[in-house]
C-alpha cells in the first residue's frame, strides 16, 4: 500500500512536469534542451513504474541474472527514496526550464554550413568508405551485430566513431536546409535505414530519432508542421518500442534464457528504475558499497579518455563496478556490462547526498549548452551527452566528447575576443 501511494504521487507530479515540457517543446518558438531531457527522464524512470501496475512487475525469468533487482523493487524504503529522487530531479528540471522559457532569445538556432559543407558531406559517407577499404563489406550483407558479423573490436570502435560523426553531420546538413521537400524526406528515411543496418544495434535508431527531433524543433518555425509532429510523436515512439521487441525476438533472441519474454527484455533495455532501486537497496538497506570510494566513477566518467597506460590506477567505468556488484564477478572477469544511469551512478558514489548533487549536476550540464552564444551544433552535442549521462556509458561516444571539447574551446575563444574588441 505504501509503495503504491508513493509511486502514485511520484507519477502524478512527474506526469504533470512531463506534460508541460512536451507542450512547451512544440508550442514555444524556441525549444530548450531541458524540455527534451525531461521527456527522456520520464520515459526511462517513470514509464517503467507505470508498466509495473499495468503489465506487471518483471520476474526476470528471461534475464535471470537480474533477479537481484527484485528485493529493491519490493522494499518500501527503497521505493520511497527512489520516488523522492525522481521527483527532485524532475522538479529541478521544471523550474530551470520555466526560467529559461521566459527568455525567448537565449540561443542561436541558425546554422550556416558554409565552407564546412564538403567536409561534412564526406563525413556522412565515411562509414561506407571504411567498409569498402577495410574489406569488410561482404560481412554486412546480413543485419546483425558486430559479434555475429565476426568483426574485431578495433574495427568496431572505428566504425562506431564514423557512424556517430556521420549522423551528427547529416543531421546538421539536413535540418540546415531551409526548404525540405518530399525528396529530402526520402533521403532521411534511406539514410536512417543505412546507418541502422551498418550499426546492427537498436540504439543508433533511437539516437537518430532524438537528434532529428531536436534539430527539427530548433529550426522549424512552421506552426502547422510542429503541431502535426506533436500529435504523431507518441506513435513514432511506440513504433520504436515495437522495433525493439522485433529485434529481441527475431534478430537477436536470447537462446540461453528460460521462458523468453519480450516485455522483460524491453524493461531491461528501456528501464532504469530497477537498477537505480538496486543500488539504493544495496547501499541504504544492506550497507554494501558499489564503488571503492566516493566520486570514483564520477572521476572515471569525466576522465575516461585518458589511456590506462598513462594512468595505471585509473578507475574503471561505472557500468563495470555496477555489473560486478550484480553478477558477483570480479571486474576483470565480466562477460558483459549492465547499462548504467546517472541516477544510480551519483547515488552509488555519494549515497543520499548524491540525489541533490545529481539534480544540480544535470542542471549545470544542461546550462553549459543553453547559454546565449551556443550554436546549433553544440546544442545537438549537448543533448546527446545529456542522454549519455542519463542512460548510457560515456566511453562509446568518444567522438562526440572530442567534438564538444573543440566547440566549447572555440566558443570560449570567440567570446573572449568579442569582449576584448568591445572594451
Predicted ranges, named:
Residues 1-105, 188-193, 216-241, 419-423:
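N-terminal "leader" segments that precede or initiate the main folded domain
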Residues 14-25, 166-176, 357-369:
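Hydrophobic, aromatic-rich transmembrane alpha-helices
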Residues 28-42, 114-120, 180-187, 369-381:
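Membrane-interfacial loop-to-transmembrane alpha-helix junctions, especially the N-terminal start
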Residues 36-42, 184-194, 232-239, 359-364, ...:
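Central hydrophobic cores of alpha-helical transmembrane segments
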Residues 59-80, 94-222, 239-253, 325-327:
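Membrane-embedded catalytic interface detector for glycan/lipid assembly enzymes
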Residues 168, 335-423:
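Hydrophobic alpha-helical segments
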Residues 226-317:
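Aromatic-rich transmembrane-lumenal/periplasmic boundary elements in polytopic membrane proteins
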Residues 293-353:
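Long extracytoplasmic/lumenal interhelical loops at the membrane interface
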Amino acid at each position: 500500500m505504501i509503495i503504491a501511494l508513493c509511486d502514485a504521487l511520484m507519477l502524478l507530479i512527474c506526469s504533470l512536469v512531463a506534460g508541460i515540457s512536451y507542450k512547451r517543446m512544440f508550442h514555444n518558438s524556441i525549444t530548450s534542451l531541458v524540455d527534451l531531457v525531461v521527456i527522456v527522464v520520464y520515459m526511462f524512470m517513470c514509464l517503467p513504474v507505470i508498466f509495473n501496475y499495468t503489465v506487471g512487475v518483471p520476474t526476470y525469468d528471461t534475464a535471470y541474472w537480474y533477479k537481484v533487482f527484485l528485493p529493491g523493487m519490493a522494499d518500501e524504503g527503497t521505493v520511497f527514496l527512489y520516488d523522492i529522487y525522481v521527483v527532485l530531479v524532475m522538479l529541478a528540471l521544471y523550474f530551470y526550464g520555466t526560467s529559461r522559457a521566459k527568455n525567448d532569445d537565449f540561443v542561436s538556432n541558425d546554422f550556416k554550413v558554409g565552407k564546412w559543407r564538403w567536409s561534412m558531406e564526406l563525413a556522412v559517407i565515411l562509414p561506407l568508405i571504411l567498409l569498402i577499404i577495410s574489406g569488410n563489406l561482404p560481412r554486412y550483407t546480413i543485419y546483425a551485430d558486430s559479434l555475429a558479423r565476426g568483426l574485431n573490436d578495433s574495427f568496431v570502435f572505428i566504425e562506431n566513431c564514423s557512424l556517430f560523426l556521420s549522423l551528427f553531420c547529416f543531421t546538421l546538413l539536413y535540418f540546415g536546409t531551409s526548404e525540405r521537400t518530399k525528396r529530402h524526406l526520402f533521403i532521411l528515411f534511406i539514410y536512417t535505414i543505412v546507418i541502422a543496418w551498418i550499426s546492427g544495434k537498436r540504439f543508433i535508431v533511437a539516437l537518430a530519432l532524438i537528434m532529428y527531433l531536436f534539430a527539427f524543433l530548433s529550426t522549424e518555425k512552421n506552426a502547422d508542421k510542429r503541431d502535426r509532429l506533436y500529435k504523431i510523436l507518441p506513435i513514432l515512439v511506440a513504433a520504436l518500442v515495437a522495433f525493439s521487441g522485433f529485434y529481441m525476438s527475431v534478430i537477436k533472441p536470447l537462446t540461453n534464457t528460460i521462458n523468453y519474454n519480450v516485455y522483460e527484455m524491453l524493461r531491461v533495455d528501456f528501464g532504469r528504475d530497477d537498477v537505480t532501486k538496486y543500488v539504493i537497496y544495496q547501499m541504504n538497506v544492506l550497507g554494501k558499497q558499489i564503488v571503492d570510494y566516493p566520486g570514483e566513477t564520477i572521476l572515471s566518467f569525466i576522465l575516461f579518455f585518458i589511456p590506462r597506460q598513462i594512468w595505471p590506477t585509473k578507475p574503471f567505468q561505472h557500468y563495470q563496478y555496477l555489473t560486478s556488484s550484480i553478477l558477483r564477478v570480479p571486474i576483470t572477469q565480466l562477460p558483459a556490462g549492465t547499462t548504467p544511469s546517472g541516477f544510480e551512478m551519483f547515488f552509488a558514489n555519494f549515497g543520499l547526498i548524491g540525489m541533490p548533487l545529481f539534480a544540480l549536476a544535470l542542471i549545470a550540464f544542461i546550462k553549459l549548452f543553453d547559454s546565449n552564444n551556443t550554436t546549433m551544433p553544440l546544442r545537438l552535442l549537448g543533448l546527446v551527452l545529456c542522454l549519455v549521462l542519463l542512460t548510457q556509458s560515456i566511453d562509446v561516444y568518444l567522438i562526440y566528447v572530442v567534438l564538444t571539447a573543440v566547440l566549447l574551446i572555440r566558443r570560449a575563444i570567440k567570446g573572449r575576443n568579442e569582449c576584448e574588441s568591445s572594451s
